[in-house]
């Protein structure tokens, strides 16, 4: 069993990432920001392709939480923005989307008014009306449709997220999945994902527990607190035996469904003895941690008294397994607890046979550090099998660009207005600047080096055999009339001064779709594991990519319907295709 803290940087440099079960990641060495990260898999059984995408994530810059300092298991959520102060819980507040991007209200038009009033969703009618407001990320990258539904009574609000792959996510439909002020139900700070459904009728249902006073000494500084705001992930159920097209939560707050799989997050209710398989049903009240703490960034107290002690995977096949709830796998978490700060120090995976027999545990933490090198230059000791190759600074720069640097960098490259303070902070945090008040020359040089590192990191990725990619643009704006003319002049050569993001899989619906043909030797690269948004395929091109306009197919022309039918669009909704006014066929010039 390995203790995480206490290693010197020299020791960490020699440690190889552990080989984890499928779905897990490894130790990531700290970059210029000084942050290290680890990802541990949860014992999640594969279903018919639709299982919860959850894992334990560690960041050395993370705060305290239900898994100890630095660790988290975040589900999809939407929250009010707090970086500019405490939310006012009115129309002046800003929201943060599931990817952390600020949300803005979608423009209202005559064809698509925003907001609208709804009494139903599909074939499901509601007993009241809802005001539905569409939002989108301020910087578009995920291409989902986001709707904020507000009912007639206080606290009766939730979010719908229509993913680009057709999956529908429901967030905060019931009070159990909303983090709100206990004294004001309408003051909701976070909406947690509560249900997801695929076009094939496969569902995932998330259950949460509210904080309470169980096993808490309610005297002293704990007296008089209202601790009911916090929500803990309790169960994730999936593998519904019978497919259903509609969300279960439309008609019931507690769906009565036959689930085949349940992932249980246990906070001490079922016992943590590794020799005793825990039961499916909680046997006791949950345990209290030694280092309770509170958060106040939303304007009310969010008190945390719990630690997740284990994660359990149950199967429900009574005819095949002989019992209703069969434990198959268990991630047992062990902590170094004290009243000051609790740290996760060990994570063991245990597997169980159908008769309850426990297989030998798998240690998921890092292997012990290798012995120190021999003195006196003796090189007879074999090389440590834990030695690894560090990730290059160029790949680190590309990874950060994909996560949050793309907006600033591309605005700078295009000569648009950009947040200079944010740019300086980025360069400072990535060690491209040594001061937050550089001269103009120092700033330009640092930006040049940073952009060059991103480009070199991109060029180091493997080439692919893709021959066509897509890009959606919104050019039908008065301010972009000159740009539209450039893109609609056959034979014209467009030079994109910024990094150009494209999709090899889907044509994102907008008024203009670029059908971009590639030749062997092009400089575009699939980001793959380097990408921050793992769910989407992205081919990125370096700055100053040249594209030649070969043909334009306008809406209403003879070839438009034929070419449109050949495109794989980002949304199957036929109404959205009316937004497409033109398809521009162009080719990347390698020279």
Curated annotation (Swiss-Prot):
<keyword id="KW-0808">Transferase</keyword>
<keyword id="KW-0843">Virulence</keyword>
<comment type="function">
    <text>Mono-ADP-ribosylates eukaryotic muscle and non-muscle actin on 'Arg-177'. ADP-ribosylation prevents the polymerization of G-actin to F-actin, causing actin filament depolymerization, destruction of the cytoskeleton and cytotoxicity. Does not possess NAD(+)-glycohydrolase activity, unlike most mART enzymes.</text>
</comment>
<keyword id="KW-0548">Nucleotidyltransferase</keyword>
<protein>
    <recommendedName>
        <fullName>Mono(ADP-ribosyl)transferase SpvB</fullName>
        <ecNumber>2.4.2.31</ecNumber>
    </recommendedName>
</protein>
<dbReference type="GO" id="GO:0005576">
    <property type="term" value="C:extracellular region"/>
</dbReference>
<feature type="domain" description="TR mART core">
    <location>
        <begin position="373"/>
        <end position="576"/>
    </location>
</feature>
<dbReference type="InterPro" id="IPR003540">
    <property type="entry name" value="ADP-ribosyltransferase"/>
</dbReference>
<keyword id="KW-0614">Plasmid</keyword>
<feature type="active site">
    <location>
        <position position="501"/>
    </location>
</feature>
<keyword id="KW-0521">NADP</keyword>
<comment type="similarity">
    <text>Belongs to the SpvB family.</text>
</comment>
<keyword id="KW-0800">Toxin</keyword>
<keyword id="KW-0964">Secreted</keyword>
<feature type="active site">
    <location>
        <position position="538"/>
    </location>
</feature>
<dbReference type="Pfam" id="PF03534">
    <property type="entry name" value="SpvB"/>
</dbReference>
<dbReference type="GO" id="GO:0106274">
    <property type="term" value="F:NAD+-protein-arginine ADP-ribosyltransferase activity"/>
</dbReference>
<keyword id="KW-0328">Glycosyltransferase</keyword>
<dbReference type="GO" id="GO:0005737">
    <property type="term" value="C:cytoplasm"/>
</dbReference>
<keyword id="KW-0547">Nucleotide-binding</keyword>
<feature type="active site">
    <location>
        <position position="471"/>
    </location>
</feature>
<dbReference type="GO" id="GO:0090729">
    <property type="term" value="F:toxin activity"/>
</dbReference>
<keyword id="KW-0520">NAD</keyword>
<dbReference type="Pfam" id="PF03496">
    <property type="entry name" value="ADPrib_exo_Tox"/>
</dbReference>
<dbReference type="GO" id="GO:0016779">
    <property type="term" value="F:nucleotidyltransferase activity"/>
</dbReference>
<dbReference type="GO" id="GO:0000166">
    <property type="term" value="F:nucleotide binding"/>
</dbReference>
<dbReference type="InterPro" id="IPR003284">
    <property type="entry name" value="Sal_SpvB"/>
</dbReference>
């Amino acid at each position: 069993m390995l203790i995480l803290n206490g290693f010197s940087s020299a020791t960490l440099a020699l440690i190889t990432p552990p080989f984890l079960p499928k779905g897990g990641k490894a130790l990531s060495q700290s970059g210029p920001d000084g942050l290290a990260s680890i990802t541990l898999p949860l014992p999640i059984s594969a279903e018919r392709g639709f299982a919860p995408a959850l894992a334990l994530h560690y960041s050395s810059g993370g705060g305290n939480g239900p898994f100890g300092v630095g660790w988290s298991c975040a589900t999809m959520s939407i929250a009010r923005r707090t970086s500019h102060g405490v939310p006012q819980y009115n129309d002046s507040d800003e929201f943060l989307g599931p990817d952390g991007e600020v949300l803005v209200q979608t423009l209202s038009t005559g064809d698509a008014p925003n907001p609208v009033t709804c009494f139903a969703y599909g074939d499901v009618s509601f007993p009241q009306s809802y005001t539905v407001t569409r939002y989108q990320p301020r910087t578009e990258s995920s291409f989902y449709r986001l709707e904020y539904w507000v009912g007639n009574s206080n606290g009766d609000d939730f979010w719908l997220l229509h993913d680009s792959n057709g999956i529908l996510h429901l967030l905060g439909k019931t009070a159990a999945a909303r983090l709100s002020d206990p004294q004001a139900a309408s003051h909701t700070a976070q909406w947690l994902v509560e249900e997801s459904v695929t076009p094939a009728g496969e569902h995932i249902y998330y259950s949460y527990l509210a904080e309470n006073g169980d096993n808490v000494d309610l005297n002293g500084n704990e007296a008089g607190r209202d601790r009911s705001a916090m929500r803990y992930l309790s169960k994730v159920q999936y593998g519904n035996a019978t497919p259903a097209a509609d969300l279960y939560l439309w008609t019931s707050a507690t769906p009565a469904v036959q689930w085949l799989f349940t992932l249980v997050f246990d906070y001490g209710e079922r016992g943590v003895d590794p020799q005793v398989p825990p039961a499916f049903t909680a046997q006791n009240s949950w345990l209290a941690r030694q280092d309770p703490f509170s958060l106040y960034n939303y304007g009310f107290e969010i008190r945390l008294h719990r630690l997740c002690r284990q994660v359990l995977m149950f199967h429900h096949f009574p005819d095949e397994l002989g019992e209703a709830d069969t434990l198959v796998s268990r991630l047992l978490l062990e902590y170094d607890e004290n009243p000051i700060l609790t740290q996760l120090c060990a994570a063991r995976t245990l597997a169980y046979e159908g008769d309850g027999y426990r297989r030998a545990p798998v240690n998921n933490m890092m292997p012990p550090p290798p012995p120190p090198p021999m003195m006196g230059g003796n090189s007879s000791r074999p090389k440590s099998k834990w030695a690894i190759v560090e990730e290059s600074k160029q790949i680190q720069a590309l990874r950060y660009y994909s996560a949050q640097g793309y907006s600033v960098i591309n605005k700078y490259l295009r000569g648009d207005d950009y947040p200079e303070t944010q740019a300086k902070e980025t360069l400072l945090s990535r060690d491209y600047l040594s001061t937050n008040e550089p001269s103009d020359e120092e700033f330009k040089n640092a930006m040049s080096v940073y952009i060059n590192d991103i480009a070199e990191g991109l060029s180091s990725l493997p080439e692919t055999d893709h021959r066509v990619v897509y890009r959606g643009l919104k050019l039908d704006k008065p301010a972009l009339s000159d740009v539209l003319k450039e893109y609609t002049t056959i034979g014209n050569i467009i030079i994109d001064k910024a990094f150009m993001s494209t999709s090899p899989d889907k044509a994102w619906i907008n008024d203009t779709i670029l059908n971009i043909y590639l030749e062997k030797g092009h400089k575009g690269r699939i980001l793959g594991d380097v990408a921050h948004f793992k769910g989407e395929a992205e081919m990125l091109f370096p700055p100053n990519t040249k594209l030649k306009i070969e043909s334009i197919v306008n809406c209403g022309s003879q070839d438009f319907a034929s070419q449109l039918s050949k495109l794989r669009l980002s949304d199957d909704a036929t109404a959205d295709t009316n937004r497409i006014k033109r398809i521009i066929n162009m080719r990347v010039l390698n020279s």
